[in-house]
Amino acid sequence: MDIKKTKNDTTLTLAIQGRIDTTTAPQLETELKADLDGVTELRLDFGQVEYISSAGLRVLLSAQKLMNRQGKMVLTHVSE
């Protein structure tokens, strides 16, 4: 899994590429939590995500709970 981060003022965008599974979910969680201070909009670009496991979904739920307190979270380019 590769993560490209872009931060503009209070918006943090993570473009994720590859698989989010039990091996890579902790990396995603660490990357998310490292830059959330002062962020009011978290954007996750799933255009290049091939797979997400329940461990990855847990990380997303945790991020959503945090963002509910300080702003909003948006998922983009999610496949069906």
Question: What are the roles of these predicted feature ranges?
Answer:
Residues 2-30, 47-48:
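STAS-typified acidic loop motif
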Residues 22-80:
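Amphipathic alpha-helical interaction surfaces in cytosolic regulatory modules
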